[in-house]
């Protein structure tokens, strides 16, 4: 079978790999779709701590169960051949203080599928433990459902935010994560949601998913301060613009991933005087099952967010397009033989 392989830092190839064989309590999944995100570029560029090469990328994955290992059809996580599924890519040691105190996402032995040591889903078929595999309803679009993994990250982002009913929320970045955080805001009790992006084309997507207040600069908005400000860009310029816009007693969240060696300037005195909270959020923590439930009950509008699908052979093209900030969510569909533009193409969703 065919797979994308990050052979070493900066080296990408498409290669033949052996067919996967499931171990105990594992299944083989035929990949339907796998989303491309910034983590994939960080991994290829050697910027993600602990990555072991060669590695098959791909951690935002859905597919169909095609084979069962011993015991995979037993217990509360039992699966069957033919099930459509979404896959939680995270695994942890389960033994360290962080794991034992409920902070598994911060485990120093965290192993993200397609990120650290375990091969990901940018291949025609892959294995996963049943504990990480979540069954989808038969009527759930298995391609759009590849947004469930980033949705699980967004739900955890809201979990760690101190908030009140009727807060006013400002989100920087109208990419995938910004759009998900903004769409969840009303369900988290927000009275209003404002989204900022320097790219007007991305604000068109924000309008399509229902975000009313959209600007290329926060200075153009109809408010000067917000209770909650969330940066989904990792841009130092956005962070430095956003922190002063937090209302007294409010909270600023670092959701986007800034470069590891980057620093931002802010006023410690203002944080002290106005009791501004600054919080981070990392990956998924007990939120994947909730993401499945929220996706399947229509919490987000997925269709406008996915613009292109690519074959395995066009993975490098997809990465170039992602780095250039073109399109919306880009997907690789390893078992399709044509790369396609999905938006504005009736009948082309699959």
Positions of PLM-derived features:
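NAD(P)H dinucleotide-binding glycine-rich loop of Rossmann-like/cofactor-binding domains
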Residues: 93-172
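C-terminal hydrophobic helical "lid"/dimerization subdomain
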Residues: 285-350
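Short, well-ordered loop/turn sites that connect or cap secondary structure elements
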Residues: 76-79, 163, 246
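N-terminal glycine-rich cofactor-binding segment
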Residues: 3-21, 38-67, 84-87, 107-119
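Glycine-rich beta-strand-centered segment in the early N-terminal region that forms part
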Residues: 20-34, 48-97, 137-139
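Glycine-rich cofactor phosphate-binding loops and adjacent beta1-alpha1 units
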Residues: 161, 204-276
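Short glycine-centered segments of the SAM/dcSAM-binding site in methyltransferase folds
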Residues: 84, 168, 250-251, 277
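Mid-domain Rossmann-like dinucleotide-binding core that forms the NAD(H)/NADP(H) cofactor-binding site
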Residues: 140-219
């Amino acid at each position: 079978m065919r797979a994308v392989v990050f052979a070493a830092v900066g080296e990408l190839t498409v290669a033949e790999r052996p067919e996967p064989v499931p171990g105990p309590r594992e299944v083989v999944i035929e990949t339907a779709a796998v989303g491309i995100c910034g983590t994939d570029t960080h991994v290829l560029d050697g910027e993600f701590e602990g990555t072991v090469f060669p590695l098959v990328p791909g951690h935002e994955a859905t597919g169909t169960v095609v084979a069962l290992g011993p015991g995979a059809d037993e217990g509360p996580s039992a699966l069957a051949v033919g099930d459509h599924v979404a896959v939680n890519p995270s695994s942890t040691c389960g033994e360290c203080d962080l794991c034992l105190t409920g902070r598994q996402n911060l485990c120093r032995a965290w192993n993200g599928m397609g990120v650290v040591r375990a091969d990901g889903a940018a291949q025609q078929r892959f294995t996963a433990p049943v504990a990480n595999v979540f069954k989808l309803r038969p009527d759930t679009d298995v391609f759009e459902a590849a947004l469930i993994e980033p949705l699980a990250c967004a739900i955890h982002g809201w979990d760690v935010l101190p908030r009140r009913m009727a807060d006013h929320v400002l989100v920087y970045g109208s990419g995938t994560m910004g759009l998900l955080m903004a769409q969840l805001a009303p369900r988290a009790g927000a009275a209003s949601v404002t989204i900022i992006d320097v790219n007007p084309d991305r604000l068109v997507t924000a309008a399509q998913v229902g975000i009313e207040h959209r600007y290329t600069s926060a200075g153009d908005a109809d408010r000067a301060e917000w209770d909650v400000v969330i940066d989904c860009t990792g841009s130092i310029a956005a962070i430095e613009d956003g922190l002063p816009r937090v209302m007294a007693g409010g909270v600023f969240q670092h959701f986007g991933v800034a470069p590891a060696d980057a620093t931002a300037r802010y006023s410690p005195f203002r944080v002290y005087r106005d009791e501004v909270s600054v919080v981070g959020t990392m990956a998924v923590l007990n939120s994947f099952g909730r993401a499945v439930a929220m996706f399947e009950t229509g919490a987000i509008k997925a269709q406008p967010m996915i613009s292109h699908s690519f074959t395995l052979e066009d993975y490098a093209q997809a990465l170039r397009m992602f780095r250039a900030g073109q399109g919306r969510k880009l997907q690789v569909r390893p078992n399709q033989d044509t790369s396609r533009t999905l938006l504005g193409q009736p009948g082309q969703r699959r």
